[in-house]
Amino acid sequence: MLPFRSYVCEPLSWGRLVLAGDAGHTVPPTGAKGLNLAFCDVRALVPQIAAFFADDARDSAPLDEYSRTALDRVWRAQSFSYWATTLLHRQPEENSFTRRRRRGEFDALTLTESGRTCFADAYTGWTV
């Protein structure tokens, strides 16, 4: 069995160097967020690159803004992916209390409308 790993590089920009997608952040496959985050990065980065090249001084402020905006979204996705991984995957060292607590959390999530709504909102993502 392979461990799930997550990584976030902060910041996502250094001067003229910019990271996007898996180059800047990885998430475990549980939440299916990796490719969606990459697309969101590109969508947020394109106007900032245009602003960078529109300024003859090549001020890195637009690229720094991309980093701040992207990282807000990335950390929300990291939080969801971590939570979903710990909820849906039994850990080898898990004891009976933790297993039952995890099952109770899963039931609270799936057996109530508010739980299902919360999960759906987090799973489908937030506005870019």
Residue spans of the language-model regions?
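Extended, folded domain segments that form the structural surfaces/walls around functional sites
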Residues: L12, F39-A50, A54
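Short acidic-hydrophobic sequence patches enriched in Asp/Glu that either
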Residues: G34-D41, R58
